[in-house]
Amino acid sequence: MVKDILAPGLRVVFCGINPGLSSANTGFPFAHPANRFWKVIHLAGFTDRQLKPEEAEKLLDFRCGVTKLVDRPTVQATEVKLHELRSGGRNLIEKIEDYQPAALAVLGKQAFEQGFSQRGIAWGKQKIAIGATMVWVLPNPSGLNRIKTEKLVEAYRELDQALIMSGL
């Protein structure tokens, strides 16, 4: 089981779709060697060094957290069922209402659209919010995603810069 890393007062909570098998086996988020999450959040400015999956709890030192839409591990996120994403979206809203981070970053456009019953959304900041929490949709850092690392860093950096401009 991959546990959430959450606390009140975070700048951002990154929300993955669901754990891959590497994460399920180790208990650490974004654990597959091909997953670029740890590299991307470092290069985008969220951490002062590249953390390892087993150091996930240290995200709290940088006022960052992680959660997921669906607890069930799969080989690919495409194996997650629509009803799981919808249920996960409802559960995620409750978590965000409880912890009230400045921003929620859902990592994947299709997962966001299905989990939040939205259509035709763009990358970046969304029109909806959860209380005072800004909602962003960023590309998923999975190694299965063909987007170049530089583009991932650029998208994540846009969120980091928006938080800095907000005084966070």
From Swiss-Prot:
Q: What is its EC number?
A: 3.2.2.28
State the compartments where it is located.
Cytoplasm
Q: Name one GO molecular function term.
A: uracil DNA N-glycosylase activity
Q: A GO biological process this protein is involved in?
A: base-excision repair, AP site formation
Q: Which Pfam families match?
A: UDG (PF03167)
The GO cellular component terms are:
cytoplasm
> What keywords are assigned to this protein?
Cytoplasm, DNA damage, DNA excision, DNA repair, DNA-binding, Hydrolase
- Domain of life according to the entry: Bacteria
Assembly description: Binds DNA as a monomer.
Query: What does the UniProt record say this protein does?
Result: Excises ethenocytosine and uracil, which can arise by alkylation or deamination of cytosine, respectively, from the corresponding mispairs with guanine in ds-DNA. It is capable of hydrolyzing the carbon-nitrogen bond between the sugar-phosphate backbone of the DNA and the mispaired base. The complementary strand guanine functions in substrate recognition. Required for DNA damage lesion repair in stationary-phase cells.
Name this protein carries in UniProt: G/U mismatch-specific DNA glycosylase
Taxonomy, top ranks, is: Bacteria, Pseudomonadati, Pseudomonadota, Gammaproteobacteria, Enterobacterales
Name the gene for this chain: mug
